[in-house]
Regions:
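Short hydrophobic targeting helices and cationic amphipathic motifs
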Residues: 36, 43-45, 53
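N-terminal nucleophile
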Residues: 59-263
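Basic polycationic patches enriched in arginine
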Residues: 6, 36-39, 62
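Serine residues within intrinsically disordered or low-complexity segments
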Residues: 10-11, 15, 24, 43
Length: 263
């Protein structure tokens, strides 16, 4: 259940479907860090506190996936958003390298977002533009909560969704509420609107994208300092990349480590 005193007053209560859909086949057993796992597909998992209700989009929407590795860490001391910088397309299980300079972590006044999944936006002229440019443009001079931000993003992308009906844009969020408390949340932006997992104020972490070699059931002490979380994020991405290099002919995780801090 949302705490309206902590989140923006303009933010809606979660839909009844989100609150009550605890029997979805996408649910897994709770994990030690207090979050549950929502299966986007067998190869891509992300920790969530509630399932998204709209998972009946056509299968072809997932035949081509933009592979990333991103995450957020949360303690009572602050939030760390992190990611690699590699962009790869996966089609029928085969990865194709695109670039090692893709920005995936962004910071607003009171929130950090990390994005994975689709990262190309088509405007009214149907010319492609990197998602990072759209996000940076909206963030310039933006004042408001993360939910205000995503509502604005969805409106901005209406032209895209009118011609790309099945595209989904995924985000991990770390935020500071009106009481100064730190929380995490996830959302998905699609033609159906903006869907939220529901906020959590527990110390812990969320990751998204290609997670086969990432940490599982990582424990984040409630008093872990921001500096230590920053170093931990660097270790997480570095070790994930190293293990992938050992095991895979092509590693979809790579490039420079990106980190943003909210404290």
């Amino acid at each position: 259940m949302y705490n309206n005193n902590r989140l923006a007053k303009s933010s809606p209560e979660p839909s009844k479907a989100i609150q009550e859909n605890t029997t979805s086949p996408h649910w897994c057993e709770p994990v030690q860090n207090g979050f549950r796992t929502f299966r986007i597909e067998d190869s891509f998992q992300t920790g969530m506190t509630a399932p998204f209700p709209h998972d009946t989009m056509e299968k072809k929407a997932r035949e081509v996936t933009i592979v990333s590795y991103v995450g957020v860490l949360r303690s009572d001391e602050g939030i760390i958003g992190f990611s690699d910088s590699r962009c790869s397309y996966q089609n029928d299980g085969v990865c194709q390298y695109v670039a090692d300079d893709v920005k995936k972590v962004f910071k607003g006044t009171d929130f950090i977002i990390a994005t994975y999944g689709a990262n190309v936006v088509y405007g009214e002229d149907q010319k492609p533009e990197r998602l990072e440019k759209v996000l940076d443009r909206i963030l310039t001079g933006f004042s408001g909560t993360h939910r205000d931000f995503f509502e604005k993003l969805q409106v901005t992308m209406r032209a895209h969704f009118s011609s790309h009906l099945n595209d989904q844009f995924h985000f991990l969020i770390g935020f500071r509420d009106y009481d100064g408390l730190f929380g995490t949340e996830e959302c998905r932006v699609s033609r159906l609107g903006v869907e939220y997992s529901g906020p959590s104020y527990e110390s812990g972490y969320r990751t998204g994208g290609y997670q086969h070699f990432g940490p599982k059931d990582l424990i984040i002490p409630f008093n872990l300092s921001v500096e230590r979380m920053r170093k931990l994020a660097e270790v997480i991405v570095d070790s994930t990349e190293r293990m992938g290099n050992l095991c895979l002919d092509y590693n979809p995780v790579g490039g420079k480590v990106q980190i943003e801090v909210l404290s």
